[in-house]
Amino acid sequence: MSKKGLKLGVALAAGAGAAAILTKTSQENKEIKATKAKKAEAARSDYRNTERGKYEKNSKGIYYTNGNYEAFARPEKPEGVDDKNAYIVGSGLASLAAACFLVRDGQMPGSHIHILEAMDIAGGACDGIFDPTRGYVMRGGREMENHFECLWDLFRSIPSIETPGVSVLDEYYWLNKHDPNYSLCRATVNRGEDAHTDGKFNLSQKGCMEIMKLFMTKDEDLYDKTIEDVFDDEVFNSTFWLYWRTMFAFENWHSALEMKLYFQRFIHHIAGLPDFSALKFTKYNQYDSLILPMQKYLEDAGVDFQFNTEVTNVIFDFKDGKKIASAIECKVNGVEKGIVLTENDLVFVTNGSCTEGTIYGDQNHAPNGDAEVRTSGCWSLWKNIAAQDPSFGHPEKFCSDINKTNWESATVTTLDDKIIPYITDICKRDPRTGKVVTGGIVSCQDSKWLLSWTINRQGQFKDQDKDKVCVWVYGLFTDVPGDYIKKPMKDCTGKEITAEWLYHLGVPEDQIDELAEHSAVCVPTMMPYITAFFMPRTKGDRPDVIPDGCVNFGFLGQFADTPRDTVFTTEYSVRTAMEAVYGLLGVDRGVPEVWGSVYDIRELLSSSVKLMDGKSPLEIDIPGAGIIKKPLLHFIKGTVIEKILRDYDVLKDGM
């Protein structure tokens, strides 16, 4: 056979073989499709519309709900609760909330609840004290809003310690009705001049598109990514970013995932971002307004507070797929002690801390010192627990780079009337009326420290002299020289921080040093881990509130993981507490879901227009969009869709 004939024969044979394979493949595909069709038909025939099982508990022993039916219901007493004890590590907001839920909804005897606190005072990060050697100290403040569902569920039941017969929520509600919060000057430039941000975000079309893209990105696509990975200068140079990073303390290197969650969580408040009209504040500092009423409620219930008790580890037994907390290791007044546990002993631990390692300065001393992770404390405790099982999280993701997690705040207290006029010129209100003053932070837009300051209702402390004003100041950039004080904020005394603040208030330079020395006292606080929870993360870095397999142990607070909610809020602390108690104790009541504005078409339409400073999304210049826009608008004409688009200013006159 010739070579040509041989090649032809081979080709024919190959073709026949390929045809046979294709025929076989085609037949197999038909069979697969037929099988799928049969399964789909079987599924349809088995389908039944019902709401039975709609609120079945998940693997954590909880379910989420919304609406008044569940919100107003009182759960039955869980079975066997009288035979159980609870050990709560820490006495911050999350821990106290857990104890309150154990008392109110779990109906556990107060004497069975033991709060183990390393310090000699409750409150954790929710502080507010007068230090005779330094002055008034507030490391931070608490911005709240009407859709903190778990927080308000709790505080409706906590009696006021000022007004007999009403709750903390009642007081708070009335206060913010009578004295609503809003700012009259959001930012300044050129030493005290109004920056005239004028309620605008000043985002370009590209910047808006970057935000919208982030908004729609899946969580898993944002694991370990930074904000710099998803935004560029189109966002970073906008007024939106000035508002955002100063209000929430986000830095460019922080988590893109948390940024997205924040945007989704508070989408209903986009319009209130420029003037803080979305926010509500307590009457006093958070210690007096939130912590003390909770502590009294618990003490009245017989809860056992054990101060000067530092928990260093929780030991686990692992058997038959169960993770059982079997012992607590602690130091009581420096003496080592152990607490043996059974499955009937519930343990709740606040893992990590944003205020651990705080270094305090004073009027004449900078807050210098060792800001590294210590051999004790919340971070060490979490590391000891995490070493026992991967499901207990990865603390090192959050506490290993203090250059990226620190900032510094300071409490400035005026001593006379000399600084007051400069404050009044900016915020347009007298700070001594007892009403809203700045209405949120005033950001010094051109400050090298990116300094912001706020004055809440005075007095912030119950025993505060009515002629004194407490100002909270913070700087995002602590390692660069200032504009008046030519050294980094972290190296500055209280007096020097006051001087830098006065410079940005517009005080004449020849008066600054005198006023900083004699007309105010300042207490600076450096917090190495204050934004640790904003560090980029992936799934599993934060442990679940109740890790899989745990039968008597749960995590609380800002470093425990719960779906959809956002850290650095009072709501997050209370939500994790509610979930942990309900899940471990078997409380048969729904946990209020995170407010669902992200799924509300009205909020989405409204926020889109607000973000674009009144421009409609339909005005965005997208190649090819005009071809389909006209037919679509014609299709919806006269329908409820057209009405809602017009109601929320997406469809404007002439469109």
What are these regions (language model features)?
Residues 103-130:
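Glycine-rich FAD pyrophosphate-binding loop
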Residues 267-282, 344-346, 351-576, 582-596:
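C-terminal segments that line or cap access tunnels to active or ligand-binding sites in enzymes
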Residues 90-93:
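Glycine-rich Rossmann-fold phosphate-binding loop(s) that bind the pyrophosphate
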Residues 161-268, 280-281:
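Rossmann-like flavin
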Residues 264-346, 351-352, 364-365, 370-379:
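Helical element adjacent to the flavin cofactor pocket in flavoenzyme catalytic cores
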Residues 98-111, 297, 301-303:
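A short, Lys/Arg-enriched amphipathic alpha-helix followed by its capping loop at the start of a domain
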Residues 134-174:
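Conserved FAD-binding subdomain of flavin-dependent enzymes
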Residues 4-86, 104-110, 611-655:
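Extreme N-terminal leader/targeting segments of oxidoreductases
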